[in-house]
Each structure stands twice: as C-alpha cells, then as structure tokens.
From Swiss-Prot:
This is Pyrimidine/purine nucleoside phosphorylase. InterPro entries: Ppnp (IPR009664), RmlC-like_jellyroll (IPR014710), RmlC_Cupin_sf (IPR011051). SUPFAM superfamilies: RmlC-like cupins. Belongs to the nucleoside phosphorylase PpnP family. Keywords: Glycosyltransferase, Transferase. Catalyzes the phosphorolysis of diverse nucleosides, yielding D-ribose 1-phosphate and the respective free bases. Can use uridine, adenosine, guanosine, cytidine, thymidine, inosine and xanthosine as substrates. Also catalyzes the reverse reactions. It catalyses: a purine D-ribonucleoside + phosphate = a purine nucleobase + alpha-D-ribose 1-phosphate; adenosine + phosphate = alpha-D-ribose 1-phosphate + adenine; cytidine + phosphate = cytosine + alpha-D-ribose 1-phosphate; guanosine + phosphate = alpha-D-ribose 1-phosphate + guanine. Coiled coil: none annotated. Its EC number is 2.4.2.1, 2.4.2.2. One of its GO terms (molecular function) is thymidine phosphorylase activity. One of its GO terms (cellular component) is cytosol.
Amino acid sequence: MRQFENVTIVKKANVYYEGKVTSRTVLFQDGSKKTLGILMPGQYDFGTDEKEIMEILDGDMLVKLPGEDSWKEIKGAQSFEVPAKSRFQMDVKKISDYCCSYIG
C-alpha cells in the first residue's frame, strides 16, 4: 500500500534518541494504528507493548530480534515482526524510512 486513505494524523511527533528517530502516528477508522518515521544512522534499543510489524520502506540496517543470537541484515524494502512485551536492537547504517504497524 503506497498511501493511506481516510486517516487521522497526530500532529505531535514521536521523538526518540535526541531526534535521531522520529515518527508520526496514523490512526485508522477501524481503530488500528501505525507510525511512519525516519531512523538516522546509529544504534538503538526499543521495547514493545504490542506486537509490531516493522516495514522498512528504504534503508540499510542490522536488526537483532528477541531470542536471536545473530543480527539480520535489512536492505531496501523488507519487514520483520517483533513480539509484544519484548526488546529489539537496530544498528542503522544509512537514513531509513519505516512504517510500523501495531497488532493489539
């Protein structure tokens, strides 16, 4: 899906890691939620409340998912899932564009 129709955008940005990670929340009529954001190069550790599907629209990074011993390379358009109530790490190599879907 290249665009979203009939949504509400929350104006206030979600800002993490001193502005190196930012996103905007997109609310859908069915009650679901996504965030659209940008990751600057750097190393990040994130926690989840809900299950998340991270769709990398463009970028270059390594991702270490919960329970995994090794890092997974993500280049270009790829996605990965993160369980609820867990943590994952990202080592972003170049500016990356993402869409995160929250599965409650």
